[in-house]
Amino acid sequence: MEEKLGFKPLPAAIALGLALLIWFVIPVPEGVTPQAWHLLAMFVGVIAAIIGKAMPIGAISIIAIMLVAITGVTSDKPADAMKDALSSFSSPLIWLIGVAIMISRGILKTGLGARIGYLFISVFGKKTLGIGYSLALSELLLAPVTPSNTARGGGIIHPVMKAIASSYDSDPEKGTQGRMGKYLALVNYHSNPITSAMFITATAPNPLVVDIVAKTTNTNIHLSWSTWALAMLLPGLAAIALMPLVLYFFYPPEIKQTPNAAEFAKQKLAEQGPMSRGEKIMLAIFAILLILWAGVPAMLFGKAYAVDATTTAFIGLSLLLLSGVLTWDDILKEKSAWDTITWFAALVMMATFLNKLGLITWFSAMLSNSIEHLGIGWMGASALLLLAYMYAHYMFASTTAHITAMFGAFYAAGLALGAPPMLFALLMAAASSIMMTLTHYATGTSPVIFGSGYTTLAEWWKAGFIMSVVNLAVFVIVGAVWWKMLGYY
């Protein structure tokens, strides 16, 4: 019956029921427009359908786009409503994600990915845990000079991780992801939010945090690059040290000990022989991507020579096509890229209009006022604000949108309730990256790695929640002590 219908009846019914309940039964709160409330109903229904696997996520997204267009929640004019529903397909972030996946195919096709994987194994391959730490440290080394966390985690580290997993025949298509691919994919991803929190230049929205903090405090607090890096150094390193161990405990790989891995890797490298033409071109393009993503031209020659992260991705893909390393058929066959572009665009669109229609602003103001009247002191109030701010990211498909919508209101509320400005600024700044752990649509890196198929949706969300708790605890406890020692509050 499920095959004939094209959807699973029970999860589809639950998703529809939730949407109808919010739309028709729960009254529209004061201060919220009917359009915003109805869009929330659809958003909740879509997320429920995705979680319940009522249909493939891309198919659900097509239906979501149709519903936004036909209900007219964003515009009374049908043509404008359709434009709104498709608006995120023009988002540079969406295409950065998709093109990063396409580029990673070149690393695998040429064999360069396997070569890098074997080199990693020869050095760190005695234990799977050691390979996990090597991926995390690679992320950390790249983070200060890679402003796109999607490019870093999805375009640079992820192909290497896939190559290592493949070398142990850990492949989702073969049902062998549990050997080590699942664990390594989770380490690959959860390195990303931690390193993003450690440097202003590690993810695009961090400068926005700096700007909001400065404006809210009338420039009394300005988080410079060095101040931010020093503040996040100790808690960040502690989080990086804990993360592979925590994931190892909850998602232990089937292959734990690899005592012969170094010799095995050397044999494989010998079998590969000298680098092929394709590998050399791929390596050169890889270097070009890294240089441009790191913003080296702008550093050397000024802002006029800055290259956008998505433009960089298209440069890389264009060079791969021109050189013949990848063909257009290769691009067309990269189903996960096209699937990711579709579903991520739909979710970003819905989250964007929840913000534009004022629902997120209403929610932030309501929560801030409610906490203020509890009379629980600045510590309790700040804790509630921090938790509400971070876990509200379940409703967002963009960290930039989330920070824009909520950071200022929540930070101002914390200051009004007596929170030390520098302490609360650093905690909120850390939470702005830690919240990326939560879902498979939380940031650009998540759909790239989740789309590789190493984990189920339930496993991804469970790991995300666990790591959000661990990371937040580390930054609150270690951070608070470290920042006190530095005299920040």
Predicted regions and their residues:
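Hydrophobic transmembrane alpha-helices of multi-pass small-molecule transporters
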Residues: 1-96, 216, 220, 226-365, ...
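Hydrophobic, membrane-inserted alpha-helices
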Residues: 17-20, 41-48, 135-141, 188-191, ...
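Membrane-embedded alpha-helical segments and adjacent helix-loop junctions characteristic
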Residues: 28, 59-172, 334, 338-417
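Re-entrant/interfacial helical elements at transmembrane boundaries that shape
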Residues: 65, 150-166, 185, 198-217, ...
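Alpha-helical transmembrane segments
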Residues: 91-101, 146-156, 228-244, 423-435
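Alpha-helical transmembrane segments of multi-pass membrane proteins
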Residues: 97, 129-143, 169-196, 222-231, ...
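C-terminal transmembrane helix pair
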Residues: 167-173, 233, 346-350, 360, ...
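Membrane-core helix-loop-helix motifs of multi-pass transport proteins
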Residues: 168-256, 446-479, 489
